[in-house]
Amino acid sequence: MNRLLKTIIENNRKWISEGKVASYIPELSKMDKNLLGISVCTLGGEEYWEGDAEVKFTIQSISKIVTLMLAIIDNGEDYVFSKVGMEPTETAFNSIVNLEAKESHKPINPMINAGAIVVASMVAGKDSDEKFDRILKFTRKISGNNDIDINLNVYESEKETGHRNRALAYFMKSTGALKGNVEEILDVYFKQCSIEITCKDLARIGVMLANDGVSPYTGDRIVPRHVARIVKTIMVTCGMYDASGNFAVHIGIPAKSGVGGGIIACAPRRMGIGVLGTALDEKGNSIAGTKILEELSKQLDLSIF
């Protein structure tokens, strides 16, 4: 497996030149464009990795699957999906278009920024600190890594420049789609996006999802089966922003990307995968990371379709 991963990384390193690091968050623009790594965890608990698999980077939008799991556990799926939809979108992840066009003003799915902000508001906690503390502890639990923490520099950078997210949140507040203190909810959202992880952490979360919520390392149930299945389904339909259909056709496994360059993926009942490629395409997905997953999926016949 390690030889295969090494070959796949080298085969797809050429794609880095076609992407750019995220620049709209100043702290992310400092990232090394050439980072490329992969980690794979099997249902048997075996771990393989190559490249920059142990380099820390911020989770960004991959945190949306973490908070979605937690919000469903806290509130039940019926309540969560009464506040946020579950349909794919053809618009960008930070678009306001559907919020204005739809009569309910409900965000179209939990993987776009507007939807994730509403989901963050549904995580239980008496204030923003308690909500984020629960998100951080849950991230540590599902990854099996108690050392995971927030990158405060990225958090401050996001908070200072998150004007589009503020616009989305205040628009939803004006229509009644978002309840609570907007600045406190945004603080939770900016913090969750600034959690620092590695490819190895993502692969361990991925294999837990691949195993329907059970840790292959301990045999313990970490997430209810129905929650794991809901999240995997949303990952397939919405996880790669407005490139989710293309990803499903060419790779065919549940995945979620983040503008920090990470992608988490899982092949149900087979493996979890974490990829890092900091150079992004115009949709905000890792360009080399996507190509790596495409080759891995073809080599191992991972597609669920």
Curated annotation (Swiss-Prot):
An individual GO BP term: glutamate biosynthetic process
Keywords: Hydrolase
Top-level taxon of origin: Bacteria
InterPro entries attached to this UniProt entry: Beta-lactam/transpept-like, Glutaminase
Documented EC number(s): 3.5.1.2
Binding sites annotated in the UniProt record for substrate: 61, 113, 158, 165, 189, 241, 259
A UniProt-annotated Pfam family: Glutaminase
EC primary class: hydrolase
Cystines in this chain: none
Catalytic activity from the UniProt record: L-glutamine + H2O = L-glutamate + NH4(+)
GO molecular function terms attached to this record: glutaminase activity
Quaternary structure note: Homotetramer.
Family: Belongs to the glutaminase family.
Designated name of the protein: Glutaminase
Organism, scientific name: Clostridium botulinum (strain Hall / ATCC 3502 / NCTC 13319 / Type A)
